[in-house]
Amino acid sequence: MITNVSPKKWLLMSLGAMLLSGCATTSTDPSRQNVGTTGLLICAQNELCPVVTVSWNESNKELLKLKIHLSSTYNKYEIHKVEFTNEKDFQTFAVTGSTEHDHVLGTNRSTNYILAPVNLMSSLKGTNSIKMNIYTDQGIISRYVYKDGVSAPILGEFQKVYQ
């Protein structure tokens, strides 16, 4: 038996145990499953690295919803459009609305999304690179999805959703 424990500590431990047991027994809503998968692009160590969430567009299964998140300590970005290119062809997509801004753990996060065809990546195959250009009010942020045999994690996420 534990002795010399203050009533305050007992209360905190009891509340913690109830919280953990409540989380462990909460069922998952099936409508929330397969919401989307998230991946990164190929980025250098000191570059802003966009996070992209790929999910189905609920109103049209021929389209994917690509949500782009830009997190920066100093800047908020207005995302205007997104372009994918393999240096032979390119596909440009306008964002669907105004950019959302929030502040998470001391970081500014700018978020917007585009709708793209499910076969986007397969339509850009056949070259040594696929690049994603994000057009913002502060310039173009260019990062690779695929380059010289190296795939960004987001390419695998596209393939998971496409299957």
Predicted regions and their residues:
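Bacterial N-terminal signal peptides that target proteins for export
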Residues: I2-L11
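C-terminal motif of bacterial Sec signal peptides marking the signal peptidase cleavage site
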Residues: S21-G22
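An ectodomain-focused feature that recognizes extracytoplasmic/extracellular
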Residues: T25-E78
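Acidic surface patches and DE-rich sequence motifs
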Residues: A44, N57, T85-N86, T136
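Extended low-complexity, serine/threonine- and proline-enriched intrinsically disordered segments
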Residues: S72, K76-V95, I134
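Internal interaction segment
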Residues: F90-Q163
